[in-house]
């Protein structure tokens, strides 16, 4: 087994050949590489699958052996300095490897169909493969400096993927916002790493933990303790930015401007989990500083509540899920701050699969809506224009519903087990935090079912938008850099555009991961898959052609169905079944896996729970979630609008002082939520405008004062010289007289100054 571990360093580099080969192909055979661009999905999935096989084998060995392996190579050795690189294999690494590879493979398969119409297909897979390489290197790093290198590579890939369609101004602004916000946290992380090295003289985790503990317990110097606390806070600031925790969360909703597969991989399962990974990796260091642990829990509970409330009024389906991600990662951060290491990792796993399912489901919905509204994210992602999709996309609907129920904490789905464990632990930590956490569980159920009901229930609202004559649908393609260009195929009609397809020059292509051949129609030099049937409706004696969303193809549905299985069964790895087993059997896989980490943290490894106590505690949380679902159903389910004609609802709806006051309160809450709590506005006014004005003032001072003094001295010398030239008349005797005169004046001034100082 140890022989196997010696070759695991290759895990981080298995996926690297894909971007290198694509780059070489574009340089040497550009035409052939572009024509055969769809084949590059296969090696991307194949190489990541090889990593997944290694990861599964590693996961099984970790469960059986409960050991930690570390291999390092010295790169630079000096008397006072040594820099080593290597890899660390422990339970945390094995969990993240499984998470990255499984979700990554499913997203790559999904992307083969989702991005097939995009001319930047090759560029997309280059970025994705390089991101997977960076993320694998991050979780296997053996020291802080190595983590920082891969941390920055992950941030760079995130910048490239968010700005994939950078010709759209809103996309370029979003990727810049993500880059700058993460640089704030990364700068703090770098300062924290350098500060820790100055204190301990090492970057290695084991050395850091031992030296740090000795400094804390054996040194009574208050100044030294404050500096150590500051370094720990700076390390935590990097995790705040990367995991979109308050107050550096503002980049995550804007990051949804990237393609939907990116949102599923980066902003649900992997990159935002990097901050959680860093805190979990450094938890033995943080746990000896109570102030830092309290700060981690405080940031977590603020993010939990803030993310849930900001999701209330979002119209964009992906932004709503983004705020949900922010809130759920807050639960994980809260668990780490409370010291519930096992519960935090458990929720990280269950949330990653459930949220990836929801993002891929939203991508399937957007993909279906684009057939009607064209490539226009403002329309295809707007839940106000959706509704009634149940009969059109039934498989997507079921998958999305299961992901929604899981996130709401409904048993027996995955997130129920992990979230309930965090909620139960919060009671023993702080009753106030527990009340907020339980209340947010109800808010989560409310806003998630709001998303579900607006999307799938009722009628397809885009038809009513078109009927009013305000909107007209167009046929869009996506250029190489994501720039939208409309191609209206037929003369616009009042209700919906009449879409016709010329089959004269159509080509048939197949996806590597598609289970049937699909036609791709060539129209005006652009390529677009038409996945929607045309339904002919007789209307006033004439025939009109309407297009409706249709279920996505199998290549998109297959990853969603696999994630459904994870959502249904992944929670079983952390359920404490031990009291029902024989003594020699242990079905609590997660607790058994985390034995080395829990021993390092000096925590109780026996997580068995009395089932009567568990059912009693979970009943309360499920009741709160059910209440949130009920409120969302009563407000957003279409049956509510039909009941408005009933007498008792009309009585409730009558205007009065109390009703007017209630409406004002609701409007204030809605505006606060829709405008993101005015946090972005505050940052724009206080930071962006402040820095801009400071830059303008600095520029003015540089041009007018600094350059003015320099140029003024030059101009003064020039004009003085010109004046003296004409006064002297060319006589040397006159020049000597002026020279003696100025020397005399200088001596008089100097003597007066000297005498004044001597008198003092």
UniProtKB/Swiss-Prot annotation:
Coiled coil: none
Topological relation to the membrane, as annotated: Multi-pass membrane protein
InterPro entries in the cross-refs: NADH_UbQ_OxRdtase_chlpt_su5_C, NADHpl_OxRdtase_5_subgr, ND/Mrp_TM, NU5C-like, Proton_antipo_N
Any Pfam family matching the protein: Proton_antipo_C
Entry superkingdom: Eukaryota
Known EC number: 7.1.1.-
Protein's job: NDH shuttles electrons from NAD(P)H:plastoquinone, via FMN and iron-sulfur (Fe-S) centers, to quinones in the photosynthetic chain and possibly in a chloroplast respiratory chain. The immediate electron acceptor for the enzyme in this species is believed to be plastoquinone. Couples the redox reaction to proton translocation, and thus conserves the redox energy in a proton gradient.
The name this protein goes by in its record: NAD(P)H-quinone oxidoreductase subunit 5, chloroplastic
Lineage: Eukaryota, Viridiplantae, Streptophyta, Embryophyta, Tracheophyta
